[in-house]
């Protein structure tokens, strides 16, 4: 949209802009291929001389309309959808890294992302230094290497709920001449825009709050357009030197601020796949329309539930950035003054055993791997999502053995609290 609107309006009106007589609702372009009148025109598409669609493995109109909406919400210049949040994080890093390169990553990122970067990408020859997000800038500077290509972290860590000091990590990245990549899944662009604090690339698992209904798996990457790749051309040859697979095109020369997303789309998506299905993109768009309303309820419910847990005699500890007693309260107020997220972590005095018993007695909340949708759900990360990590890695990631991850939904908050109360009473 040409005019700048509030996020609530963007969520409804941005993306698909129907012309006279066209459908009011975003269409699903359920087609693998697209027809052209001449061979020459299709050839221009393959040479990147003309924009358009020819195969859904690379691009699809439904996806692009939804990506444009997310891009506007984040304040970026270009965006793309992927098949999952994991794919988004992989593409975001691999788009600028290759064998022999190095990544700096916050230790408290989601377990699947931790494994992706420290184990899977290591097999590709990409090394990673895992850092304490609370370390001083001077300590963090010691991890910079000549082959460092990016710094990676999460706005709010899953499930440790560590609030990243985005400005500190942006300073670290930019002193190293590399971009800061931030996974903004838990905060969503409704509560935080990392670009305003120095981040360069933002990723999302759209599976979570953006979809909001646990119906689709997907991811997104948004480029701020602020990082000057050409100023550090020697670090980023994939963007700043000719690509032999496209007749020698140099992305930064041909596409300017759109270089990063263009390369990820036409090169990585072409070679690796991982496009989001158009029907999933359509359902994601439906979720985005109510994202501001849902985030308001998620956050208000979570605040009340966290306060209940903090005052319960059988609860050993509670971690929620909205509590004044929380270690990250001030950072949360700085970066997310309207609210952080709907996820709480806590532990019972009965420990790890009590956690399992409590979860087994829940009646309203469900035990599921998922997090951040409309329904209240719980998980024991040490037994589930982080099961592949060693005890040392769990401690490093901020995942205590007794940690229960509670994703507070948008049901009536009194019903949520009543369910937790009866289950906790039966946990001994």
Q: PLM ranges: what are they?
A:
Residues 1-60, 68:
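N-terminal "arm"/small-domain region of PLP-dependent enzymes with the aminotransferase-like
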Residues 2, 8-17, 79-311:
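Conserved PLP-enzyme active-site core in the AAT-like
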Residues 16, 30-36, 225-226, 288-290, ...:
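Glycine-rich beta-alpha junction loops
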Residues 38-90, 112-120:
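Conserved N-terminal alpha-helix of the aminotransferase class I/II PLP-enzyme fold
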Residues 118, 127-128, 142, 146-149, ...:
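PLP-dependent enzyme catalytic core of the Aspartate aminotransferase-like
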Residues 151, 219-221, 318, 344, ...:
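Well-ordered beta-strand positions enriched in small/hydrophobic/aromatic, beta-favoring residues
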Residues 272-275, 279-281, 286, 290, ...:
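Conserved small-domain helix->loop->beta segment predominantly found in fold-type I
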């Amino acid at each position: 949209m040409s005019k700048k609107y509030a996020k609530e309006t963007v969520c409804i009106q941005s993306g698909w802009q129907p012309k006279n007589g066209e459908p009011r609702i975003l269409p699903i372009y359920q087609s693998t291929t697209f027809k052209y009148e001449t061979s020459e025109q299709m050839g221009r598409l393959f040479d990147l001389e003309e924009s358009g669609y020819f195969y859904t493995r690379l691009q699809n109109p439904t996806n692009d309309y939804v990506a444009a909406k997310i891009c506007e919400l984040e304040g970026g210049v270009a965006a793309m959808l992927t098949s999952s949040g994991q794919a988004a994080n992989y593409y975001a890093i691999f788009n600028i890294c290759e064998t022999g390169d190095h990544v700096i990553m916050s230790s408290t990122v989601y377990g699947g992302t931790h494994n992706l970067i420290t184990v899977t990408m290591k097999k590709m020859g990409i090394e990673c230094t895992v850092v304490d997000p609370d370390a001083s800038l001077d300590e963090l500077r010691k991890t910079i290497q000549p082959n460092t290509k990016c710094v990676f972290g999460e706005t709010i860590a899953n499930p440790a709920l560590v609030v990243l000091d985005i400005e500190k990590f942006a300073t670290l990245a930019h002193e190293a001449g590399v971009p800061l990549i931030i996974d903004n899944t838990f905060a969503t662009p409704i509560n935080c825009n990392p670009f305003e604090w120095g981040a360069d690339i933002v990723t999302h698992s759209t599976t979570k709050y953006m979809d909001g209904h646990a119906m689709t798996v997907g991811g997104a990457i948004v480029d701020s357009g602020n990082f000057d790749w050409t100023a550090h051309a020697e670090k980023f040859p994939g963007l700043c030197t000719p690509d032999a697979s496209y007749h020698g095109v140099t992305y930064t020369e041909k596409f300017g601020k759109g270089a990063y997303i263009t390369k990820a789309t036409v090169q990585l998506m072409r070679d690796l796949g991982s496009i989001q299905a158009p029907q999933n993109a359509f359902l994601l768009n439906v979720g985005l329309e109510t994202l501001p309303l849902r985030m308001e309820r998620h956050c208000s419910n979570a605040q009340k539930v966290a306060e209940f847990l903090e005052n319960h005699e059988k609860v050993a500890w509670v971690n929620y950035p909205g509590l004044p007693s929380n270690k990250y309260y001030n950072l949360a107020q700085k970066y997310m003054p309207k609210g952080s997220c709907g996820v709480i972590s806590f532990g019972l005095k009965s420990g790890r055993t009590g956690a399992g018993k409590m979860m087994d007695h829940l009646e309203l909340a469900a035990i599921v791997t998922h997090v951040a949708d409309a329904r209240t759900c719980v998980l024991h990360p040490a037994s589930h999502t982080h099961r592949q990590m060693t005890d040392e890695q769990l401690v490093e990631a901020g995942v205590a053995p007794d940690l229960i991850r509670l994703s507070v939904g948008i049901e009536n908050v009194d019903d949520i609290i009543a369910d937790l109360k009866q289950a906790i009473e039966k946990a001994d």
